[in-house]
Curated annotation (Swiss-Prot):
This is Protein PA-X. Belongs to the influenza viruses PA-X family. The keyword Protease does not apply. Plays a major role in the shutoff of the host protein expression by cleaving mRNAs probably via an endonuclease activity. This host shutoff allows the virus to escape from the host antiviral response. Hijacks host RNA splicing machinery to selectively target host RNAs containing introns for destruction. This may explain the preferential degradation of RNAs that have undergone co- or post-transcriptional processing. The active site is at E80, D108. The probable endonuclease active site in the N-terminus and the basic amino acid cluster in the C-terminus are important for the shutoff activity. The C-terminus acts as a nuclear localization signal. The C-terminus is recruited to host protein complexes involved in nuclear Pol II RNA processing. It comes from Influenza A virus (strain A/Japan/305/1957 H2N2). It is found in: Host cytoplasm; Host nucleus. Keywords: Decay of host mRNAs by virus, Eukaryotic host gene expression shutoff by virus, Host cytoplasm, Host gene expression shutoff by virus, Host mRNA suppression by virus, Host nucleus, Host-virus interaction. Pfam families: Flu_PA (PF00603). Gene3D superfamilies: Influenza RNA-dependent RNA polymerase subunit PA, endonuclease domain. The record marks K202, K203, K206 as: Important for efficient shutoff activity. The gene is PA.
Length: 252
């Protein structure tokens, strides 16, 4: 699973996931399913934010190419992917600026158009079950919840899906691709079943250091959201090194 994660996800997402796990004393080499889940969640958060801006009239627009128009404002503030101290600093700043109620738990995004925090969920189970778990944990009507599954299902607070259908379809397609790639390597069952995960962990520990086959699809594109976050945690030389070493597994 660890090899799959490093091959399937953008190196910067992998780096952010490793930092997040180490912040909580977790080892990506051992808790590989959690490693995969965190990378998936990060990518969904960045895809959620990608290309969405607010123009001078306060309208939400989609711009897929880099636009020199400085009057455009990013619609979403990305909170996920930052260390806890920085994340709470961003949340406090948003609350002070917008008057939004401070959430009890760190959310993933802030939507400047709808003026609300957003909690993103990616589940391997039924979306309604995971939605209820999130809602019971957050216990706040102010935080909007949006859940995606690997089967293409989604659920959101008051059936308000925030994004246009095409943007959500991109996310669903990516999740389906990840599921298919895992399944083709015999990793999907262990990803969804704790019992199977233990078996897979034993296999992983025995075969550490060996490269798995390269996936048929790899997310090479750097998310615009990642380009915003990048200077906060990684210098350009380190980024170049990561990109140069991307997909370094030799073909068998």
């Amino acid at each position: 699973m660890e090899d799959f994660v490093r091959q399937c996800f953008n190196p910067m997402i992998v780096e952010l996931a490793e930092k997040a796990m180490k912040e909580y004393g977790e080892d990506p080499k051992i808790e590989t399913n959690k490693f995969a889940a965190i990378c998936t969640h990060l990518e969904v958060c960045f895809m959620y934010s990608d290309f969405h801006f607010i123009n001078e009239q306060g309208e939400s627009i989609i711009v897929e190419l880099d636009d020199p128009n400085a009057l455009l404002k990013h619609r979403f503030e990305i909170i996920e992917g930052r260390d806890r101290t920085m994340a709470w600093t961003v949340v406090n700043s948003i609350c002070n600026t917008t008057g939004a109620e401070k959430p009890k738990f760190l959310p993933d995004l802030y939507d400047y158009k709808e003026n609300r925090f957003i909690e993103i969920g990616v589940t391997r189970r039924e979306v309604h079950i995971y939605y209820l778990e999130k809602a019971n944990k957050i216990k706040s009507e102010k935080t909007h919840i949006h859940i995606f599954s690997f089967t293409g299902e989604e659920m959101a607070t008051k059936a308000d899906y925030t994004l246009d259908e095409e943007s959500r379809a991109r996310i669903k397609t990516r999740l389906f691709t990840i599921r298919q790639e895992m399944a083709s390597r015999g990793l999907w069952d262990s990803f969804v079943s704790p019992k199977e995960a233990k078996k897979q962990l034993k296999k992983d520990l025995k075969s550490q250091g060996q490269c798995a086959g390269s996936p048929t699809k790899v997310s090479r594109r750097t998310s615009p959201a990642l380009r915003i976050l990048e200077p906060m945690w990684m210098d350009s030389n380190r980024t170049a090194t990561l990109r140069a070493s991307f997909l370094k597994c030799p073909k068998k």
